[in-house]
């Protein structure tokens, strides 16, 4: 919260001095409501996979990882609002030691949300690539145990990177490293897509004989990736502009949309579960069983 709040205060200062564009301010109730819905939706996804043995496969493990990332992004805003309420009620000393520590923890959740989403989408992309072009070896190459190990490595790296970024968040190299992860992830996934496209053209007949579920999973990834880019790209651009051209009047007008960009990030956590449910009959069935309290096989 400290780093994001400082950023927002700096934006407001820039608006008043360098631009005719007033900052767009949204009610805190909007943030809180979206965050609570995001946590509940992704918690349902996790419970559905945990309770349904038919969903306990590497693909759904990676989806659960993405759901956890979305939950962290929603929890970030909920905890931030709680801290603000406590501070306004006088229970926290402004800029005090406890608040500073709590701010770092909350900011770490935000960083973890982005890093976890990037890595989870990359893992899903790699999984779909293997599913389509190494279908016969898939069961041998991608086992639940190997998927679990990959996820442990991913989250260990995310936690380490998140702590480092929060610790050095006021240094330009740290900001560049943080924002660079976004395009690097896109390049990695687009390279996989490009390779898949070239192989699909040269092996059109073999690809057409693949199980429909394999191709459907690739389409699901495409939708998830598109939503992720739409929701996160404006904020990443915001960070870059705030770092390199905060005084420019054109940049300042874009920076006025800080809270709008923040809402887009939280909407990502709400949209993803609907994509899972819409694209996966197995998950839809699991959700229905959870709603009517029917036992799983």
Curated annotation (Swiss-Prot):
This is Adrenocorticotropic hormone receptor. Belongs to the G-protein coupled receptor 1 family. Hormone receptor primarily expressed in adrenal cortex that plays a key role in regulating adrenocortical function. Upon corticotropin (ACTH) binding, facilitates the release of adrenal glucocorticoids, including cortisol and corticosterone. In addition, MC2R is required for fetal and neonatal adrenal gland development. Mechanistically, activates adenylate cyclase (cAMP), the MAPK cascade as well as the cAMP-dependent protein kinase A pathway leading to steroidogenic factor 1/NR5A1-mediated transcriptional activation. Expressed in skin and adrenal gland tissues. InterPro entries: ACTH_rcpt, GPCR_Rhodpsn, GPCR_Rhodpsn_7TM, Melcrt_ACTH_rcpt. Keywords: Cell membrane, Disulfide bond, G-protein coupled receptor, Glycoprotein, Lipoprotein, Membrane, Palmitate, Receptor, Transducer, Transmembrane, Transmembrane helix, Ubl conjugation. PANTHER family: G-PROTEIN COUPLED RECEPTOR (PTHR22750). Residues 50-58, 127-147, 200-217, 279-297 are cytoplasmic. Homodimer. Interacts with corticotropin (ACTH). Interacts with MRAP; this interaction targets MC2R to the plasma membrane. Interacts with MRAP2; competing with MRAP for binding to MC2R and impairing the binding of corticotropin (ACTH). It is a multi-pass membrane protein. Residues 1-23, 80-104, 169-180, 245-256 are extracellular. A lipid is attached at residue 293 (S-palmitoyl cysteine).
């Amino acid at each position: 919260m400290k780093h994001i709040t400082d950023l927002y205060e700096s934006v407001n200062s820039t608006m008043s001095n360098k631009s005719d564009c007033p900052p767009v301010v949204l009610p805190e109730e909007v943030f809180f409501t979206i965050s609570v819905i995001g946590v509940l939706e992704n918690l349902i996804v996790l419970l559905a996979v945990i309770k349904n043995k038919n969903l306990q496969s590497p693909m759904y493990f990676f989806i659960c990882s993405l759901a956890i990332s979305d939950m962290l992004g929603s929890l970030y805003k909920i905890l931030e609002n709680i801290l603000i309420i406590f501070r306004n009620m006088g229970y926290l000393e402004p800029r005090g030691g406890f608040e500073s520590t709590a701010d770092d923890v909350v900011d770490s959740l935000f960083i973890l949300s982005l890093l976890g989403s990037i890595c989870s989408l990359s893992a899903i992309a790699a999984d779909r690539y293997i599913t389509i072009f190494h279908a016969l070896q898939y069961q041998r190459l991608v086992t639940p145990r190997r998927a679990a190990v990959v996820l442990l490595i991913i989250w260990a790296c995310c936690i380490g990177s998140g702590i480092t970024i929060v610790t050095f968040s006021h240094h330009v190299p740290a900001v560049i490293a943080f924002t660079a992860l976004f395009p690097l992830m896109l390049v990695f996934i687009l390279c996989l897509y490009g390779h898949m496209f070239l192989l699909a053209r040269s092996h059109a007949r073999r690809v057409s004989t693949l199980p429909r579920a394999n191709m459907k999973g690739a389409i699901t990834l495409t939708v998830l990736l598109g939503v992720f880019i739409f929701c996160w790209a404006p904020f990443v651009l915001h960070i870059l502009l705030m770092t390199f051209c905060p005084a420019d009047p054109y940049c300042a007008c874009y920076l006025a949309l800080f809270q709008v960009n923040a809402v887009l990030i939280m909407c990502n956590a709400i949209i993803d579960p609907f994509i899972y449910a819409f694209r996966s009959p197995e998950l839809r069935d699991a959700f229905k069983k959870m709603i009517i309290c029917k036992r799983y096989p």
